[in-house]
């Protein structure tokens, strides 16, 4: 019996392991003091959550027991590391995560883009290859293939940084890059609009620090950067699409439905409900799951 109890306890610990936390960190002094933290792990909703040093307002559970949504109030939060602990029904600590609240850096006050700006739209994979060592990555399916018209050609963040003199000489004041977050589509991933991780720069473009370095280089020149970040849909290779928190997390039909792209329907008082639904809830392409923006989480 004692041996079985030990096995049972070990299985509890194994089941409760935190696999992901998003966002992975946050900042003090944000204008919006509310923060929602997603915790993901096998059957993690079965456990109680306690937080030391952070004001945990409530914990929301969903259909899928692999998720917990933690709502915090950071009105008076200071930078530092704070424990998020999981406890079982016997009040035994099962797992722990040290969550970081960073200090906001006092950067230069740079105004938003306006009619005086010359904006240059860059598709990074097609612009310049500054680091050939990251053209392919073992974690991602599609590899570099310059012979393929729709394949990856190797452009990256380093290529943009190395050409800032050229862009500035052209009179460019603002760079708008197409999305740079990870896209693990097996084909045509160079456009990066089917994001599979919205907290990670695609390794074939560089790292999160490389993106930060690009922004710093631009700001030192008095230039601006526009971040293209997709919130309408995710790629079907995104880990959450493979294990949905709720059935209504994405838009679904009895069979696959593509958006009709008829934007005028949205403001047309005579448009049919069917056409409006297809416009708003239809998918761009089969590899891009349309997110349900009506879901409160």
What role is predicted for each listed range?
Residues 3-13:
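Sec-dependent N-terminal signal peptides
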Residues 101-121, 126, 130-131:
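Low-complexity, Pro/Ser/Thr- and charge-rich linker/hinge segments at domain boundaries
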Residues 128-173, 177-297:
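Substrate-binding/active-site clefts of carbohydrate-active enzymes
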């Amino acid at each position: 019996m004692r041996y079985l109890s030990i096995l049972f306890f070990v299985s509890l610990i194994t089941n409760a392991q935190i696999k992901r936390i998003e966002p992975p960190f946050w900042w003090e002094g944000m204008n919006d003091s509310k923060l929602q933290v997603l915790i993901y792990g096998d059957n993690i909703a079965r456990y109680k959550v306690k937080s030391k040093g952070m004001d945990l307002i409530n914990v929301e559970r969903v259909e899928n027991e692999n998720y917990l949504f933690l709502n915090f109030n950071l009105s008076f939060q200071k930078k530092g590391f704070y424990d998020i602990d999981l406890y079982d029904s016997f009040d035994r600590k099962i797992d722990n995560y040290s969550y970081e609240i960073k200090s906001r850096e006092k950067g230069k006050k740079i105004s938003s883009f306006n009619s005086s700006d010359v904006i240059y739209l860059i598709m990074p994979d097609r612009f310049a290859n500054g680091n050939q060592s990251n053209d392919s990555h073992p974690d991602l399916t599609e590899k570099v293939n310059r012979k393929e018209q729709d394949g990856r050609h190797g452009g990256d963040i380093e290529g943009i940084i190395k050409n800032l003199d050229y862009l500035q000489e052209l009179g460019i004041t603002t760079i708008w890059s197409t999305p740079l977050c990870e896209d693990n589509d097996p084909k045509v991933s160079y456009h990066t609009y089917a994001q599979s991780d919205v907290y990670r720069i695609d390794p074939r473009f560089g790292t999160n620090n490389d993106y930060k370095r690009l922004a710093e280089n631009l700001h030192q020149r008095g230039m601006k950067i526009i971040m293209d970040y997709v919130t309408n849909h995710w790629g079907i290779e995104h880990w959450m699409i493979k294990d949905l928190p709720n059935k209504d997390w994405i838009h679904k039909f009895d069979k696959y439905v593509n958006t009709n792209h008829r934007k005028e329907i949205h403001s047309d008082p005579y448009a049919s409900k069917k056409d409006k639904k297809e416009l708003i809830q239809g998918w761009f392409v089969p590899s891009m799951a349309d997110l349900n923006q009506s879901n409160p989480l």
